[in-house]
């Protein structure tokens, strides 16, 4: 059984002056489950994990697991460019009850493909739950190549898939060809969900689902149920919104959008800052076109 199929939300982390706003996080989790979200990814890039303390990350993972209470899968972001730290966080997430892990490739260190195999092998041998690799070269300066997944599979059996955010559809096709249908591929880009699903992908780990969870669930479910035309049309319809949510570094626009929509998820953490006036006006105009802003905004 795959970790999930359909729409997994890379959920934002709401903050207040005390730190993580757990009351608001709980409200968001309940809303996502009601709206049909198929999995929750906690402590990812969109969740600003890189500017959370380790204690905050662990509290957020534990809280999410307990709040979801088995209704949908909880996938914990536990990656690090320090292998030992990634192991520690992965062991914690497993002990807290996470269903799976999302582990980014090491950033900044710029290891080799051989180093990637060693890194993920070390993490995988410390846990039993499934691991989904997160490949996002634009953030890590490192691209995990298709043949590296095959080499890794010779060493471990609980690395079950990849969140592919390279933007290279040919690379995704090659991963699918080399690894076969049992290897789970999820789009890491909201504007490539249906193209990646057409190559055997099972869904998306989505930023856009933070503001329109029902729509992303509907689109991915349509494809999974064989309604290719509906899924394609929805992808094309939503792409201008996807573009607006990446006009500045994620999660700046999506968190701004959520606050504009009345979700009150609080501030960004430095070094992320508020949007420029020009980009903010553009974001507002796009949100308005999709009927996502109240008249007061």
From Swiss-Prot:
NCBIfam families given in the database record = dapA
By sequence similarity, the record places it as follows: Belongs to the DapA family.
Quaternary structure, per UniProt, is: Homotetramer; dimer of dimers.
Name it: 4-hydroxy-tetrahydrodipicolinate synthase
* Positions with a binding annotation for pyruvate: 46, 205
Q: Does the keyword Amino-acid biosynthesis apply?
A: yes
Q: Name one GO molecular function term.
A: 4-hydroxy-tetrahydrodipicolinate synthase activity
Q: Output one GO BP term.
A: diaminopimelate biosynthetic process
For this UniProt record, give its keywords in alphabetical order, as a comma-separated list.
Amino-acid biosynthesis, Cytoplasm, Diaminopimelate biosynthesis, Lyase, Lysine biosynthesis, Schiff base
Q: Which SUPFAM superfamilies match?
A: Aldolase
The pathway to which it is assigned is: Amino-acid biosynthesis; L-lysine biosynthesis via DAP pathway; (S)-tetrahydrodipicolinate from L-aspartate: step 3/4
Q: Which reaction does it catalyse?
A: L-aspartate 4-semialdehyde + pyruvate = (2S,4S)-4-hydroxy-2,3,4,5-tetrahydrodipicolinate + H2O + H(+)
Question: Could you state one GO cellular component term attached to this entry?
Answer: cytosol
Which InterPro entries does this UniProt record tie to the protein? Aldolase_TIM, DapA, DapA-like, Schiff_base-form_aldolases_AS, Schiff_base-form_aldolases_CS
- Give a yes or no for keyword Plastid in this entry: no
Major location category of this protein: cytoplasm
Q: What is its EC number?
A: 4.3.3.7
Q: Where in the cell is it found?
A: Cytoplasm
Q: Which Gene3D superfamilies match?
A: Aldolase class I
């Amino acid at each position: 059984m795959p970790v999930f199929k359909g729409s997994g939300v890379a959920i934002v982390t709401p903050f207040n002056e005390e730190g993580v706003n757990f009351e608001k996080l709980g409200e968001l989790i309940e809303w996502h489950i009601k709206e049909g979200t198929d999995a929750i990814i906690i402590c990812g890039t969109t969740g600003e994990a890189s500017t959370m303390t380790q204690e905050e990350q662990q509290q957020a993972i534990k809280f999410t697991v307990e709040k979801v209470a088995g209704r949908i899968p909880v996938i914990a972001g536990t990656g690090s460019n320090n292998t030992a730290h990634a192991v520690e966080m992965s062991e914690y997430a497993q002990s807290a009850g996470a269903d799976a892990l999302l582990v980014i490739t090491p950033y900044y260190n710029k290891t080799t493909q051989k180093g990637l195999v060693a890194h993920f092998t070390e993490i995988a041998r410390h846990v039993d739950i499934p691991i989904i690799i997160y490949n996002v070269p634009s953030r890590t300066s490192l691209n995990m190549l298709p043949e590296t997944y095959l080499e890794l599979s010779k060493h471990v059996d609980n690395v079950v898939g990849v969140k592919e955010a390279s933007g290279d559809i040919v690379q995704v096709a090659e991963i699918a060809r080399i690894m076969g249908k049992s290897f789970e591929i999820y789009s890491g880009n909201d504007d490539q969900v249906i193209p990646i699903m057409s190559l055997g992908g099972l869904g998306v780990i989505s930023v856009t689902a933070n503001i329109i969870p029902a729509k992303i669930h509907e689109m991915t479910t349509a494809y999974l149920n064989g309604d290719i035309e509906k899924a394609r049309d929805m992808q094309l319809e939503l792409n201008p919104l996807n573009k607006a949510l990446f006009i500045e570094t994620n999660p700046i626009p999506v968190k701004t959008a959520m606050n504009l929509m009345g979700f009150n998820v609080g501030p960004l953490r430095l070094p992320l800052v508020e949007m420029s006036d020009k980009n903010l006006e553009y974001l507002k105009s796009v949100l308005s076109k999709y009927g996502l802003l109240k008249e007061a905004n």
